[in-house]
Amino acid sequence: MGTVHARSLEPLPSSGTDFGALGEEAEFVEVEPEAKQEILENKDVVVQHVHFDGLERTKDDIIICEIGEVFKAKNLIEVMRRSHEAREKLLRLGIFRQVDVLIDTCHGEDALPNGLDVTFEVTELRRLTGSYNTMVGNNEGSMVLGLKLPNLLGRAEKVTFQFSYGTKETSYGLSFFKPQPGNFEKNFSVNLYKVTGQFPWSSLRETDRGVSAEYSFPLCKTSHTVKWEGVWRELGCLARTASFAVRKESGHSLKSSLSHAMVIDSRNSSILPRRGALLKVNQELAGYTGGDVSFIKEDFELQLNKPLVLDSVFSTSLWGGMLVPIGDKLSSIADRFYLGGPTSVRGFSMHSIGPQSEGDYLGGEAYWAGGLHLYTPLPFRPGQGGFGELFRTHFFLNAGNLCNLNYGEGPRAHIRKLAECIRWSYGAGIVLRLGNIARLELNYCIPMGVQRGDRICDGVQFGAGIRFL
């Protein structure tokens, strides 16, 4: 009997945070002619054994959970498909540098005429790995250095130390991550961190030292994360010209909060989707588990994408949120919402919409923002089928509002206030997709509905990030 080799044409990932996210991979099959005919003549096959070559410190139980479906295959094509799926699951664990699959006919005294053996040839990651990369955040770039201890206890546990230095934020943290065997989407993590950020639109500097524990799990078609966070916050003035409203916020505070996040995401891409929808809902309750900060905070994000003729895409998005202080204390400038900038309401400067004092923007306790977008190929389609496919022409209309509410007035008064003094803008530009890392926008913006105190960016505006309105 002959041998069937199954291997992917795509290169395997050797590092990175998104292990095993390989997408749809082509399969290359080499079959000896006589063996192929003999195997395919058998309508049904049985996977008798699954072997692993190359395991050193990985425990058997977590491996068994990932390859169980291979034994359920009933024909050769199904064996290859399920073996490929098992390979992707193994790569997603983030403990192997390489996984190859070998499918062979079964040998030995107990071998059945239609029996198959599947062998996974694996190469484990080293006990200590390092990484260096750059990241693009909310209109901010940063350099990231990391050290990682993969597969620490043999069941895909991971300890990571990361240092990040950016234009507005510097952070370092230590985290422990443990997935549930057989269900990678169910995982538990603990984080220790320190973050120092500068917010020039508020003349504010903030240093957070904290610890958090979170549990993530899927439920039907949704993903959920439950989190507890305790953080010691230190607020200070970034400049001597800081307003009195910012100066009186300076000092130390302790926040202990419970939060829940739900995500439904059917988009084909998180950076520049062509189809699908996204719904994110976040709730946070602070004060009931300790600390001197108490509030309830809710916010959501909705996005719909629809492909049109001529390779165009119509996209619409809606954001909103509300923060309600508990007790007699006012909300902190560190907890409020901010709006404006190239990643939200375009045509306005970064976080420069809403309540302000002496030029310092203080944020708001309620906001909404919406956008309509039309993405089309570049005129005359330069670079079609190649580099030119990373670019899109962008037409947009954005609107939103940010304010503080008097919670004794009732819902109708709140809606009326959010509907007053709406800021809006429109324009056009070019979008560049940087793989699955980030996207860049260069737009010509025309801000409208400008209110007193708003800081605008009339004309060309550049934006970089992952999350855009």
Swiss-Prot record:
Subcellular location, record wording: Mitochondrion outer membrane; Cytoplasm; Mitochondrion
Residues of the POTRA domain: 45-125
Domain remark in the UniProt entry: Its C-terminal part seems to contain many membrane-spanning sided beta-sheets, that have the potential to adopt a transmembrane beta-barrel type structure.
Family: Belongs to the SAM50/omp85 family.
Gene Ontology BP terms: cristae formation; mitochondrial respiratory chain complex assembly; protein insertion into mitochondrial outer membrane
Function as written in the Swiss-Prot or TrEMBL entry: Plays a crucial role in the maintenance of the structure of mitochondrial cristae and the proper assembly of the mitochondrial respiratory chain complexes. Required for the assembly of TOMM40 into the TOM complex.
Listed name of the protein: Sorting and assembly machinery component 50 homolog
Main location: mitochondrion
Tagged with keyword Mitochondrion: yes
Record's subunit section: Associates with the mitochondrial contact site and cristae organizing system (MICOS) complex, composed of at least MICOS10/MIC10, CHCHD3/MIC19, CHCHD6/MIC25, APOOL/MIC27, IMMT/MIC60, APOO/MIC23/MIC26 and QIL1/MIC13. This complex was also known under the names MINOS or MitOS complex. The MICOS complex associates with mitochondrial outer membrane proteins SAMM50, MTX1 and MTX2 (together described as components of the mitochondrial outer membrane sorting assembly machinery (SAM) complex) and DNAJC11, mitochondrial inner membrane protein TMEM11 and with HSPA9.
Superkingdom in the source lineage: Eukaryota
Lipid bilayer topology: Multi-pass membrane protein
Keywords on record: Cytoplasm, Membrane, Methylation, Mitochondrion, Mitochondrion outer membrane, Transmembrane, Transmembrane beta strand
Gene Ontology terms: cellular component: membrane; mitochondrial outer membrane; mitochondrion; SAM complex
Pfam families per record: Omp85 (PF01103)
N6-methyllysine sites (modified residues): 255
